[in-house]
Amino acid sequence: MGQKVNPNGIRLGYIRDWRSTWYADSSSYATKLNEDIKVREFLHKKLAAAAVSKIQIERPAQNAKITIHTARPGIVIGKKGEDVEKLRAEVHKLMGIPVQINIEEVRKPEIDAKLVAESVAQQLEKRVMFRRAMKKAMQAAMKSGAKGIKIMVSGRLGGAEIARSEWARDGRVPLQTFRADVDYATAEALTTYGVIGVKVWIYKGEILPGQIAEKKNNKKGAK
């Protein structure tokens, strides 16, 4: 019987990059990994209103470079960059090393799996019918250029006594093609009936070997 694997994890090293990029020996690896987890939790909590998609952490020498991908960069930066400076000071306290924070804008939040999952979860918390929330998200994604989208919600849907899962799909979502650019994310809706889990898969097209090499070269050039 086939088993489903995390679409992001299986594509690491092919068309996906790691979200933490650093090297550590066995004595300090666990400490640094724990630091990364705490920093991500802190930033997601602190920037809950800023629609944060992902946080990338690099550690060149004895420094940390954090890139925050957000759909609302204005909220993160604040007036004249005040908020981002406060944020940098707080993260510096957490990590104990000099920190540089970069902000990258998510141009199309409608085809970002994390932002779509959180949007559906927020609607479920506001008692919007799950089918309506799913349909709205799928229509917006397809209009914004997605090749396919699948959304699954699980829990006590509509306050039902027995928990169940329901899903909907528009277009195609090829999970077994490694070069298929499939963005996957999850979110949780905390409703009065309990927790409802939301999973989102968004297919954006294929990334060919030449494009992967070009992407890596551009990244090296930017550094």
Swiss-Prot record:
Gene Ontology cellular-component annotations = cytosolic small ribosomal subunit
Q: Which InterPro entries match?
A: KH_dom, KH_dom-like_a/b, KH_dom_type_2, KH_sf_prok-type, Ribosomal_S3_C_sf, Ribosomal_uS3_bac-typ, Ribosomal_uS3_C, Ribosomal_uS3_CS
Q: Which UniProt keywords apply?
A: Ribonucleoprotein, Ribosomal protein, RNA-binding, rRNA-binding
List residues of the KH type-2 domain: 39-107
GO BP annotations of the record are: translation
Give the Gene3D superfamilies listed for this entry.
3.30.300.20, Ribosomal protein S3, C-terminal domain
GO MF, any single term: mRNA binding
Q: Which SMART domains match?
A: KH
Show the Pfam families listed in the entry.
KH_2, Ribosomal_S3_C
Instruction: Summarize subunit and interaction data from the UniProt record for this chain.
Output: Part of the 30S ribosomal subunit. Forms a tight complex with proteins S10 and S14.
Q: Which family does it belong to?
A: Belongs to the universal ribosomal protein uS3 family.
User: Function, please?
Assistant: Binds the lower part of the 30S subunit head. Binds mRNA in the 70S ribosome, positioning it for translation.
This one is known as: Small ribosomal subunit protein uS3
What is the organism of origin for this protein? Francisella tularensis subsp. novicida (strain U112)
